[in-house]
Amino acid sequence: MSHGLLIGLVASCATLNPETVTSNRMLPLVLYNFARSLDLSQKYEEGAKVARCGKEACIKYGHYQVLHSCLEIEAECDFFLGKKEESVERYREAFYICKVMGYEDDLQIIRTEAEKYLNILF
């Protein structure tokens, strides 16, 4: 299945049955998992785009459990696309969300990546 088709299916999921999306937190989680898969496959342009969609879905539907993860994926993809300023900003946003929420494991992942890629110390 092509990535474009999968993105279309996920997007239509939100328009066809929005109450399922909002009550089950399905759309942000699906978009996060898809963005992660694209990032790990080194498809950074697509990964960043899907991660941004995941971020927007988190905000739109008020389900923030994967917001920091979408930001981290977007940051990493932006770094590999040469968008260092955007990457710094996304890592910073992800870091502070994790800090406020007490997500210590994810906080360490973000610290490690930001230092490795951009020499940023949080």
Task: Identify the meaning behind each predicted range.
Residues 26, 33, 66, 73, ...:
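"A position-specific structural signal for the A-helix of alpha-solenoid helical repeats
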Residues 2-5, 47, 87:
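Single-residue signature of alpha-solenoid repeat helices
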Residues 22, 29, 69, 89, ...:
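Residue register of alpha-helical TPR repeats
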Residues 9-19, 52-63, 93-103:
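Amphipathic alpha-helical segments of tetratricopeptide repeats
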